[in-house]
Structure formats: C-alpha cells, structure tokens
Amino acid sequence: MNIKQLVYISKATEPFTAASLKQLTDVANANNAKLNVTGCMAYSAGYFLQLLEGSAETVDSLYRKIEKDTRHKGTRLLLEATVDEDKRLFGKWFMSSFNVDTTVDFPAELKQNITEIINDRKAIIPVHRLFMEFRKHLGQ
C-alpha cells in the first residue's frame, strides 16, 4: 500500500515556548492517531517545518486544515511524494516535535539547512533527507 508524504514550512504568528510546542504536539498526536497519520514537526527561528505521512486523502485534508490555522502564516509546500507504506519515516510516532533552537546537540549542518529553507534558498540537504536525519537524531 502507498502513503503520501507531505512537507511544508510556515511562520508562527506568535513565538512558541516549550510548553506551547508540547501542547500542540500532544493535540496533534491524539488527532493523528485517529487518522493513522504519522510525522515530525521541527520548530526553529519562529518557523515550523513539518512532515505528514498517511493516506493521500487524509494527508491532503489535514494539510488544508493546517493551512487555515491562525497560529501560523505563509504556509509553503516543499515536498509531496507517494511512497510505499514501509518507507514511512516516523511510523512509531503519530507526531514528534522538537525545538531546533534549544536542542544543544543538534547538528550544525541540519540547523544551517533549516535556515536555507526558511530563507527560500536551495537547501544543502534535500528536505526528505533532512527528515531522515531528524529521525536519527530523535532515536527512532
């Protein structure tokens, strides 16, 4: 069976604290569990970079809902791909998140790559590989 992977970036309308990021992640985790959607969300320099994985119809519907969320603006789609179910990157997590800015041991190359994406420049690491690196860093 195939699933859809979708990656987007957006700018937070207000700064997110560790507590507000955890609250957002907890809600996403509960909602995504019901939808069989998995993924990862990175927060850096006031931006969200998120990967969603699941059935194409569900991911598309969820993305349309996310685009309307007032906690962020300037949603920009970076990647849409159809992959085999066994290529799901975050199968153990309905939603994982982390704050790149406060993660002490986060690799400098990955931070630089996020900055390149935020500034709409060609990323050093393709966005799909970036999430593979996130997965390694998060220990999945």
How should these model regions be labeled?
Residues M1-Q140:
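Charge-rich, low-complexity N-terminal segments
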